[in-house]
Curated annotation (Swiss-Prot):
Name of the protein this chain belongs to: ATP synthase subunit beta, chloroplastic
Family under the similarity heading: Belongs to the ATPase alpha/beta chains family.
Membrane association type: Peripheral membrane protein
Subcellular location field: Plastid, Chloroplast thylakoid membrane
Length: 479
């Protein structure tokens, strides 16, 4: 016996539905509206119950456009929250918020599904040991290391290499950790989603010939979708990632691009749901909404979800409630700098602006900590001397400062690295550098062992041995 109600009111993406007494659906239940509009086109809309209004009515948010819906149409209560397919079958395919494939590769086997609303792992299941998540990218591992099961904010404007960095991470976790990735595109441009998909196919992160060999599942709810979809697509992606962590016991990377759009979508429907706005017009439930998403991203004793979230900062105001609420959850930040990208230093991660709570001697060890501090001090000094160099030239500096500048320039170049997914642009094969090799390399530069090598030798190489080899070949070319 189906529980059927009728639409009583529609305001944009929000609609009210009346059910018979005693038959009210639960909050977060998914409702289906099927039928035809006056033009005879099929209507198939899924909604999610948000409020019980009393008088046997509920208020729900639609996951797709509400065009063509009318009062009095029948609404079926499915009796359960929205469920999406999970497991290996999701790899290599693109899904929407409802878990339907949208890549025209045919239907997906939905024998295993999970509801998108699940409680966070119990405190007793959490992995309390702090460990570093090695990415194989020198600048990240040395100066702002990621925490296994942590949350990382990725800041950067357009065209500084966010996408390439994301793809390299997806590639490296698959190679080094045997892990998989889930990419949640939340309220970003459809064109970017398409570009990412094409680039992933090109760099073999998605294997077209053998889809099951792919390393990533994509979930998109882009800018053109109604707010309901953008508000929930993050949970859909997270649910797919949780399956890999809890059932397959793997290390998972979860990308959310962009976490701000998740908050924005919530604020779009908040007023329509009749809630009082809070600061700057955001939803009063901002902290809770963010918390319920973020608390599910964590390490358990079985596996981990490490999440990398692109953070858009509205009007560059870091005190805006949306980014400010996000910061409370982050373990590390990776800041991309346009200045470095302009110099051709990729990945253009700003070594002085990027931070990590993991960079403590008792977590990473004295050696790593000292090396990182040394690198930062050298770069900071170089930054301070830049005005003097610009006005007076290098010759006016003291002997000590000239040495610092020379080492800083070597460090700056050594922080660049050829990526596997960017072999097309750089023409040199990608390099994965282990943390031990990274620390060794920077220690050698700081100690002055390599003062006699030209700075070009450090540009776009993997470990320090490659730099010495490159120096020799440069010398041969010079002769």
């Amino acid at each position: 016996e189906k529980n059927v109600g009728q639409i009583t009111q529609i305001i944009g993406p929000v609609l009210d539905v009346a059910f018979s007494p005693g038959k009210m659906p639960n909050i977060y239940n998914s409702l289906l509206i099927k039928g035809q509009n006056p033009a005879g086109q099929e209507i198939n809309v899924t909604c999610e119950v948000q409020q019980l209004l009393g008088n046997n009515e509920v208020r729900a948010v639609a996951m797709s456009a509400t065009d063509g819906l009318m009062r009095g149409m029948n609404v079926v209560d499915t009796g359960a929250p929205l469920s999406v397919p999970v497991g290996e079958i999701t790899l290599g395919x693109i899904f929407n918020v409802l878990g339907d494939p949208v890549d025209n590769l045919g239907p997906v086997d939905t024998s295993t599904t999970f509801p998108i609303h699940r409680s966070a792992p119990a405190f007793t299941q959490l992995d309390t040991k702090l460990s570093i998540f090695e990415t194989g990218i020198k600048v990240v591992d040395l100066l702002a290391p990621y925490r296994r099961g942590g949350k990382i904010g990725l800041f950067g404007g357009a065209g500084v290499g966010k996408t390439v960095l994301i793809m390299e991470l997806i590639n490296n976790i698959a190679k080094a950790h045997g892990g998989v990735s889930v990419f949640g595109g939340v309220g970003e441009r459809t064109r970017e989603g398409n570009d990412l998909y094409m680039e992933m196919k090109e760099s073999k992160v998605i294997n077209e010939q053998n889809i099951s060999e792919s390393k990533v599942a994509l979930v998109y709810g882009q800018m053109n979708e109604p707010p309901g979809a953008r508000m929930r697509v993050g949970l859909t992606a997270l649910t797919m990632a949780e399956y890999f962590r809890d059932v397959n016991k793997q290390d998972v990377l979860l990308f959310i691009d962009n976490i701000f759009r998740f908050v924005q979508a919530g604020s779009e429907v908040s007023a329509l749901l009749g809630r009082m706005p809070s600061a700057v017009g955001y939803q009063p439930t901002l902290g809770t909404e963010m918390g319920t998403l973020q608390e599910r991203i964590t390490s358990t004793k079985e596996g981990s979800i490490t999440s990398i979230q692109a953070v858009y900062v509205p009007a560059d105001d870091l005190t805006d409630p949306a980014p400010a609420t996000t910061f409370a959850h982050l373990d590390a930040t990776t800041v991309l700098s346009r200045g470095l990208a302009a110099k051709g230093i990729y990945p253009a991660v700003d070594p002085l602006d990027s931070t990590s709570t993991m960079l403590q001697p008792w977590i990473v060890g004295e050696e790593h900590y000292e090396t990182a501090q040394g690198v930062k001090q050298t770069l900071q000094r170089y930054k301070e001397l830049q005005d003097i160099i610009a006005i007076l030239g290098l010759d006016e500096l003291s002997e000590e400062d000239r040495l610092t500048v020379a080492r800083a320039r070597k460090i700056e170049r050594f922080l660049s690295q050829p990526f596997f997914v960017a072999e097309v642009f750089t023409g040199s094969p990608g390099k994965y550098v282990s943390l031990i090799e990274t620390i060794k390399g920077f220690q050698m530069i700081l100690s002055g062992e390599l003062d006699n090598l030209p700075e070009q030798a450090f540009y776009l190489v993997g470990n320090i041995d490659e730099a010495t080899t490159k120096a020799v070949s440069l010398q041969v070319e010079g002769q």
